[in-house]
Swiss-Prot record:
It is found in: Cytoplasm. The keyword Coiled coil does not apply. It comes from Beijerinckia indica subsp. indica (strain ATCC 9039 / DSM 1715 / NCIMB 8712). The keyword Transcription regulation applies. Its main location: cytoplasm. This is Probable transcriptional regulatory protein Bind_0345. GO terms for molecular function: DNA binding. InterPro entries: Integrase-like_N, TACO1_YebC-like_2nd/3rd_dom, TACO1_YebC_N, Transcrip_reg_TACO1-like, Transcrip_reg_TACO1-like_dom3, YebC-like.
Length: 248
């Protein structure tokens, strides 16, 4: 997952703080509401809603919050959110894709642009960097559900494209079209996954030094803290030393 997994782990550690966890729940609820509004309000019949609910459960979001977010989709006075994708460059020529759900495109665009500018990067046109990424499905299981060999065999048999396993997680990559079928096949065998959603996977990762890496991670942090930003993807790698420093 290149830079995506690296800074995702840092954000997870920082997410223990109550204020950040509250913001995370708000973002998860927004995605649940949007997913329910775009399709049926039943996770079993709505793949995007199911993915949103899985993500919420993985963060221990209370069941009541999840159900309230689903019901909000049918409320007459509910907010309407637009899905927006921003693309740009961070220091060192690193490419970033930012996905947002916003009720004010001008506000969000202005804020995202300011983050890039303050961090020494630049916001670009849509399509400027997405060709450096593959839009694919990602399924995650805890490492404890199966051995690396068993997961690899089951995933490939189900139609997955790649499997990456470590001490904590099995990450299964699928095509856009096969995500749902592969997820269902693996769930039958190993139980409910921790995640099953679409991501932007970098085709290649750029190795950056600690100075540039710190600037990039600062930009990612600014983006992640924005209420409208849902996901951030990048194509960089930093040293374990910097990760340990920022993860403390």
């Amino acid at each position: 997952m290149a830079g995506h997994s690296q800074f995702k782990n840092i954000m997870h550690k920082k997410g223990k703080q109550d204020a950040i966890r509250s913001k995370l729940f708000s973002k998860l609820a927004r995605e649940i509401t949007v997913a329910a509004k775009l399709g049926l309000p039943d996770p079993a019949m709505n793949a995007r809603l199911r993915a949103a609910v899985l993500a919420a459960r993985a963060e221990n979001m209370p069941k009541d919050n999840i159900e309230r977010a689903i019901k909000k989709a049918s409320a007459a006075d509910g907010e309407n959110y637009d899905e927006v994708r921003y693309e740009g460059y961070a220091p060192g020529g690193v490419a970033l894709i930012v996905e947002a759900l916003t009720d004010n495109r001008n506000r969000t665009a202005g804020e995202v642009r300011s983050y890039f500018t303050k961090s020494g990067g630049s916001l670009a046109e849509t399509g400027a960097v997405s060709f450096m990424f593959d839009h694919v499905g990602l399924i995650e299981f805890p490492a404890s559900v199966a051995s690396e060999e068993a997961m690899l065999e089951a995933a490939i048999e189900a139609g997955a494209e790649d499997v990456q396993s470590n001490e904590e997680t099995h990450e299964i990559i699928t095509s856009l079209e096969s995500l749902r079928d592969v997820a269902q096949a693996l769930e039958t065998k190993f139980g409910e996954p921790r995640k099953a959603s679409l991501i932007w996977k970098a085709q290649n990762a750029i190795a950056v030094d600690d100075e540039a890496g710190e600037k990039i991670l600062r930009l990612v942090n600014l983006l992640e803290e924005n209420d409208d930003v849902q996901n951030v993807y990048a194509n960089f790698e930093v040293s374990d030393t910097l990760l340990a420093k920022l993860g403390d």
